[in-house]
Structures are given as structure tokens and as C-alpha cells.
């Protein structure tokens, strides 16, 4: 059973830094943070609430927010798309969601977000097609 948005396990800056470090170690690239404030903002945005209620409808929308804000804020020197993708997958799995296996749809989604072709709502709609 998936948790409610209010009871989701959220990612921290430290977790996202570990995801980023793992992606750089595995696939190469330059380590380092380009802008710490943009990283903190990208990690905080999916945790937004108003009057104790999440501003997001469900876990998939929150995962899409991690993907969207980490891609668009571009907080790292290198590996922003990989870190955003990894954060999205980790969040989904930690919150009992089942992302479908790797396929070109994932790469297309991440590249479209990074290029500015999708807004957050469009990102959520596309992500829903990739999660069981």
C-alpha cells in the first residue's frame, strides 16, 4: 500500500548527494555542487505543504517534483539529469511504487524535462505512464 503524501518518506539533501555521487562514480563526470541553495530548493519543493497537507496529490506527483526540480535547478557541476532520475526512482521505491523497467521512455522523459519541454504537471502525467 502506498503512503499518503503526508506520510511519504522524503529524500534529504544528504540522500540526493549520495545518489549523485553514485551516478558520477558509475558513469563518470565531474563531482561537486554548483549551487547549494538550488540543491536545497530542489529537495525542499516536493515536501511543500499548506496547513499540514501536502501540495501534491500522491507519491507519483512527488516523485515527478523531485525529477523536475533537480533537472531544472541544475544544482550540480555535472550529472544533474542522472541525479534527478536516480532521486525519482529512489523516492518511488522507498514509497512502495513500482517503476516500470528501464526503457527509452525514461530517457525521453528526463531529457524533455531538462530541455524545458515539459512543465511539472506534464512531467507528472508522463511519469504516471511509467509507474505501476
Locations of regions flagged by a protein language model:
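FIC/Doc superfamily catalytic core
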Residues: 1-132
Amino acid at each position: 500500500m502506498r503512503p499518503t503524501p503526508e506520510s511519504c518518506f522524503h529524500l534529504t539533501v544528504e540522500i540526493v548527494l549520495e545518489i549523485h555521487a553514485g551516478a558520477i562514480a558509475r558513469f563518470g563526470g565531474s563531482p561537486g555542487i554548483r549551487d547549494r541553495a538550488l540543491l536545497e530548493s530542489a529537495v525542499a519543493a516536493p515536501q511543500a505543504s499548506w496547513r499540514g497537507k501536502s501540495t501534491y496529490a500522491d507519491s507519483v506527483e512527488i516523485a515527478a517534483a523531485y525529477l523536475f526540480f533537480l533537472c531544472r535547478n541544475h544544482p550540480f557541476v555535472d550529472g544533474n539529469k542522472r541525479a534527478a532520475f536516480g532521486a525519482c526512482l529512489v523516492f518511488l521505491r522507498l514509497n512502495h511504487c513500482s517503476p516500470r523497467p528501464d526503457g527509452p521512455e525514461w530517457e525521453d522523459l528526463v531529457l524533455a524535462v531538462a530541455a524545458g519541454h515539459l512543465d511539472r504537471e506534464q512531467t507528472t502525467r508522463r511519469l504516471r505512464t511509467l509507474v505501476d
